[in-house]
């Protein structure tokens, strides 16, 4: 006897899913390029990008083809074996970056967990078992595991789960003097996002990152760049460290790496990687053929002059629209970020209302993000069309007008 199929609605979420999210009332069902449609057929311009994930838009033909081809070849074998798509992708990443070794995981959290474990272990086996201090920054975000959420340091994410990993120090972002005050030879790593995404789309200053590099060298500590959100072309360079001219010891990547397919990577040097051995870390799904095939196709498109050199012009188009909205409605105190990771900070009279602007945007037919309660965030496709930018920002202007009561 056939099981009766009931309608899938937003109410279904509340009935079956753990209450760790508060999703929108509409359910997207189809995407193409920078447009999305919901169950009722309503169209949205997507400037959220799945939180900086769909770097080539939705259902890009090259990614679809890679998925279909690999899906008919080999899905999963575990890391008891290696596979061709993983080795090809690893070679591409190494040839394009400072790195000499890479390991694949499934999410930004897992890549960062790997990085932090490696940093601690490297210090332990190469220097001292007492060299365990990790220095991180206020308003950081590095993931949701107990280790990564502790390095992130935001109490709203880390409190209420019992004892946390210890010897993690947090200091103000972009404050080199604060780092110097806590840095010593017991420090194993400094962990930093070149652009704080969840923390308000705040970019590090060149002097800050250069100073961190010098301090790490002075104290034999590793410099870890979390480029989960700002990497893979988002800034206009393949990775943000290239823009700054500051090379980390370890770099993490995820989100746009797979163009929408779950995959992450941790990149490092051969010498640092040699601290690990078989069994030091692992993942059942990490580096699976499906994910690596799609990521390889995404990499081949993103790492081209056509894409990377077009990002600044697209950014300026967004900024022009935001400035026009601000001139008309007087809502933003700052427009910041880098490349196509854009933050618009709300003026004091609208502090705490970022979600109101987000919801009004969805009602007007445009998907945007917030970065905390006071900042609107835009993380669109790196190949978003000018017409989509113009249409989406016009819709966002209508949303702003509604919130401010104009």
Curated annotation (Swiss-Prot):
Homodimer. It is an enzyme of class 2 (transferase). It catalyses: N(2)-acetyl-L-ornithine + 2-oxoglutarate = N-acetyl-L-glutamate 5-semialdehyde + L-glutamate; N-succinyl-(2S,6S)-2,6-diaminopimelate + 2-oxoglutarate = (S)-2-succinylamino-6-oxoheptanedioate + L-glutamate. This is Acetylornithine/succinyldiaminopimelate aminotransferase. N(2)-acetyl-L-ornithine binds at residues 144, 283. Transmembrane segments: none annotated. The keyword Amino-acid biosynthesis applies.
């Amino acid at each position: 006897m056939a099981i009766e199929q009931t309608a899938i609605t937003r109410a279904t979420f509340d009935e079956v899913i753990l209450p760790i999210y508060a999703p929108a009332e509409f359910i997207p069902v189809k995407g193409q390029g920078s447009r999305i449609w919901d169950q009722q057929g309503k169209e949205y311009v997507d400037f959220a990008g799945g939180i900086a994930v769909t770097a080539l838009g939705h259902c890009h033909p090259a990614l679809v083809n890679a998925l279909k081809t690999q899906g008919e070849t080999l899905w999963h074998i575990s890391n008891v074996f290696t596979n061709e798509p993983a080795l090809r992708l690893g070679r591409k990443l190494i040839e394009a970056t400072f790195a000499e070794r890479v390991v694949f995981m499934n999410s930004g959290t897992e890549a960062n967990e790997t990085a932090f474990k490696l940093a601690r272990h490297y210090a332990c086996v190469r220097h001292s078992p007492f060299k365990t201090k990790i220095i991180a920054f206020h308003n950081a975000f590095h993931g949701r595991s107990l280790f990564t959420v502790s390095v992130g340091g935001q109490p709203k994410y880390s409190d209420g789960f019992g004892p946390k990993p210890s010897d993690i120090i947090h200091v103000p972002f972009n404050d080199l003097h604060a780092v110097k005050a806590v840095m010593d030879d017991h420090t194993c790593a400094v962990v930093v996002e070149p652009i704080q995404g969840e923390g308000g789309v705040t970019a590090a200053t060149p002097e800050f990152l250069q100073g961190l590099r010098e301090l790490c060298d002075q104290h034999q500590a590793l410099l870890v760049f979390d480029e989960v959100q700002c990497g893979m072309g988002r800034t206009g360079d393949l990775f943000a460290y290239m823009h700054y001219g500051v090379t980390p010891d370890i770099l993490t990547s995820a989100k746009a790496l797979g163009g929408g397919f779950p995959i992450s990577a941790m990149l490092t040097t051969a010498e640092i990687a040699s601290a690990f051995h078989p069994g030091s870390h692992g993942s059942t799904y990490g580096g699976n053929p499906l994910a690596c095939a799609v990521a390889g196709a995404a990499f081949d498109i993103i790492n081209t002059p056509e894409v990377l050199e077009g990002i600044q012009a697209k950014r300026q188009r967004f900024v022009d629209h935001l400035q026009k909205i601000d001139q008309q409605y007087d809502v933003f105190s700052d427009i910041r970020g880098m490349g196509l990771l854009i933050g618009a900070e709300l003026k004091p009279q609208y502090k705490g209302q970022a979600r109101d602007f987000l919801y009004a945007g969805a009602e007007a037919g445009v998907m945007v993000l917030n970065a905390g309660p006071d900042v609107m965030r835009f993380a669109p496709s790196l190949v978003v069309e000018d017409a989509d930018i113009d249409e989406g920002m016009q819709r966002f202007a209508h949303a702003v007008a509604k919130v401010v009561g104009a």
